[in-house]
C-alpha cells in the first residue's frame, strides 16, 4: 500500500474519544446497587440524542463480518439527526473505529481507535465515522439510534483509500498491521 495515507490506530479511552461521543464501558462508570442489592446498575453510560424533529429511539442488532487486515478506509458516514450507539453483545472480539469531527468532513482530522469487545461507543449527532469494522470474528452489536421522518445517514467516498496502522501500544495489536 505504498503511497497510501496512514491512519494510526490508538487504544480506545474515554478521554481520547470524548470529542466524538461516549465510550460505553463499566470501568470507571458511576454505579450503585439496586433490587435489594442483587444487581449492580452502571448508570447513564451514554448521551442518547435522537428525539429532535420527531425522532424516536430504535434498538436494532447489527451482525458484522470480520474485516481482513489491512483494512482500507474508503468512505465515511454521519447521522445528522441523532446519535448512534454500538454495544457489543459478546466481549470476545475487537473492532476498529474511525471518526472525524462533526461539521464539514476533513480527512486530516480523522482518528482511529481499537475497541475491546467489552467497550461500546456512542457517536454524537453529526460525527463522521466509518461503518462497523469487526476484526476478529463475526460480531453482534446492539444499536441504539434514531428513527424518524427525515433521512439520517449521509455517506461520502474518500478521494483515496486510507490504511490503518495498529500501534504496538494497543493491547493485542500484533497480527493486525
Swiss-Prot record:
NCBIfam families referenced in this protein's UniProt entry, alphabetically: PRK13395.1
Protein's UniProt keywords contain Ligase: no
Gene this protein is translated from: allA
Record pathway: Nitrogen metabolism; (S)-allantoin degradation
Task of the protein: Catalyzes the catabolism of the allantoin degradation intermediate (S)-ureidoglycolate, generating urea and glyoxylate. Involved in the utilization of allantoin as nitrogen source.
Subunit structure and binding partners: Homodimer.
InterPro entries linked to this entry: RmlC_Cupin_sf (IPR011051), UAH_cupin (IPR047233), Ureidogly_lyase (IPR007247), Ureidogly_lyase_bac (IPR023525), Ureidoglycolate_lyase_dom_sf (IPR024060)
Protein's GO biological process: allantoin catabolic process; purine nucleobase catabolic process
Family the UniProt entry places it in: Belongs to the ureidoglycolate lyase family.
Protein name per its UniProtKB record: Ureidoglycolate lyase
Alphabetically ordered keywords of this record: Lyase, Purine metabolism
Spans traversing the lipid bilayer: none
Enzyme Commission code(s) on record: 4.3.2.3
MF GO annotations: ureidoglycolate hydrolase activity; ureidoglycolate lyase activity
Cofactor: Ni(2+)
EC class (word): lyase
Annotated source species: Burkholderia cepacia (Pseudomonas cepacia)
Reactions catalysed according to its record: (S)-ureidoglycolate = urea + glyoxylate
